[in-house]
């Protein structure tokens, strides 16, 4: 089923995407935990991700780059704030410079993903919390909601193709 709802909430400075998968929470969790699986869905289909670092522990950091269809590169990072396997991940997600390190010009957004067992498999809820309305409008204007929807839309195929 993949993404079943997207909610842009400027009053609370949040973007929420809800997706459902015909798989267990543990298997959906694994597509976040394993960097090689993460590379197969983080980023829209025409902007594949490469994770050069993925320290998936509380306080750990990840570094990644998205490569566009014309070879353009955008870098980003995560900082893990809390991990409750296989229930919830809390993290900061920000832009990085050419060296892969966080850029101070644009503060990171915070976010979390939850994984809930339901009768048909797993409901994953991804929430991005913006610092202010200007940041939210800028990132939504850059296509963040559509990009996340396309990215999450790739998880179904990954779960189907991966062995149990």
Give, region by region, the residue ranges found by the protein language model:
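Hydrophobic ligand-binding cavity/cleft-lining segments
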Residues: 1-48
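Short beta-edge strand/loop motif at the mouth of beta-sheet-based domains
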Residues: 16, 36-75
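Hydrophobic/aromatic beta-strand elements that line small-molecule binding cavities or substrate pockets
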Residues: 17-19, 51-54, 76-82, 108-117
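Short coil/turn motifs at secondary-structure junctions
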Residues: 24, 69-71, 83-85, 96-98, ...
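A short, structured loop/turn motif at beta-sheet edges
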Residues: 25-26, 56-57, 81-88, 114-123
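Hydrophobic pocket/interface hotspot
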Residues: 28, 38, 62-64, 80, ...
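Short, highly charged C-terminal tails/helix-capping segments
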Residues: 51, 159-164
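Beta-strand/loop substructures that line and gate deep hydrophobic ligand-binding cavities in soluble
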Residues: 92, 99-146
